[in-house]
Design a protein with these regions (language model features):
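Intrinsic disorder/low-complexity segments
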Residues: 1-2
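Compositionally biased, intrinsically disordered low-complexity segments enriched in Pro/Arg/Gln/His
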Residues: 11-12
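N-terminal catalytic or cofactor-binding beta/alpha core of small enzyme domains
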Residues: 27-199, 204-325
Length: 325
């Protein structure tokens, strides 16, 4: 087989032939990879010693695109990349040296989305019958953003034609389920060590000014499922720190937290989950898919943020005690 680099160049050429005028090949090469397989599909990186009960997750920053997926798509790579939380994994990478485990996906969100239920599937996009247990009626499915997405960006259809149910189930078995098994193990490992754990699920959002005249968004959005996925001190600590950095912060609007926040957060057992949505204008050029000059500043502020969370007294995070105690 040809090297990954030559294979990727061949795919770019093929895709540009199919979509003349595409800017598929006009992005810096180090920003995205095209491979025939994921090696590895995701990473869980742990420090030599944890300095607190806090870990970070970046499920939507993957930018390794399977060649067969690109050829099956009717969209160019730049359009597909609009669904990426670009460089969020790089923003949190330095936290490992500060004593915090991180997890990051390498596969793209538009290929399989781990921030969904395992079988949120849209019957309109598949050839064949879906399993009876598939959730075909969720709001996310209705919007084309199920476990295997039908659309990206402004409701742009990803595929030229229907894909097989078997292909969707393959992605779920090979990527979705192993990702969650690994994330759960990492979360529970921290919980066993400290008696509690805080999972910060990191995402990014368009600034609202990249493609059209939209109202500017907050700098950061804290999502705690309206106070159900973590104890109040977690969200309060995040908000206080972020406002101290000078950022405009909102809570649960417009993002209250997705499947990961809801599924992993269980404060009654000492498991706390919170979603952190970062405005892309804070750290990148959204049109060119490049880091901006403020990237390092934000990465440093996230290190301070992690330290503040780690300073929360464990007694405030551990499982609720009976009133008699």
């Amino acid at each position: 087989m040809a090297s990954r680099a030559s294979y990727g160049q061949w795919l770019l050429a093929r895709a540009k032939e199919r979509r003349p005028g595409s800017d598929l090949g006009n992005r810096p090469a180090f920003m995205v990879e095209i491979q025939d397989e994921f090696d590895p599909p995701f990473e869980a990186v742990e420090p030599a010693a944890c300095c607190g009960a806090v870990l970070f997750n970046s499920p939507h920053s993957g930018r390794v695109y399977p060649g067969a997926f690109l050829l099956a798509s009717r969209l160019d790579l730049a359009t597909l990349r609009r669904s990426e939380d670009s460089f969020v994994d790089d923003l949190i990478a330095g936290l490992v040296e500060r004593g915090h485990p991180i997890m990051r996906a390498h596969f793209p969100r538009c290929y399989v989305d781990v921030n969904r239920e395992p079988y949120e599937l849209d019957p309109r996009m598949f050839e064949g019958r879906l399993p009876s247990f598939a959730n075909t009626r969720s709001m996310r499915v209705a919007g084309g953003l199920g476990t295997v997405a039908r659309v990206v960006g402004d409701a742009q259809e990803i595929y030229d034609q229907r894909i097989s149910v078997a292909e969707a189930l393959r992605r779920i078995e090979l990527l979705y389920k192993p990702y969650h098994r690994t994330l759960r193990r990492l979360f529970m490992r921290v919980h066993r060590e400290f008696g509690a754990a805080i999972l910060v699920d990191c995402h990014s959002m368009p600034s609202g000014t990249a493609g059209r005249d939209e109202r500017p968004r907050a700098d950061l959005v804290i999502g705690d499922r309206y106070g159900t996925s973590c104890v109040p001190v977690v969200s309060e600590t995040l908000e206080t720190a972020l406002r101290g950095f000078g950022y405009a912060v909102s809570r649960n609007k417009p993002y209250a937290g997705g499947f990961i926040t809801e599924h992993y957060g269980n404060p009654a057992t000492g498991l706390h989950a919170v979603q952190l949505e970062i405005n892309r204008a804070l750290y990148m050029d959204e049109r060119r898919y490049e880091r901006s000059a403020s990237f390092d500043r934000l990465a440093g502020e996230l290190e301070i943020l992690a330290a503040r969370l780690a300073e929360i007294p464990l007694e405030e995070l551990r499982p609720y005690r009976a009133a008699a105690e």
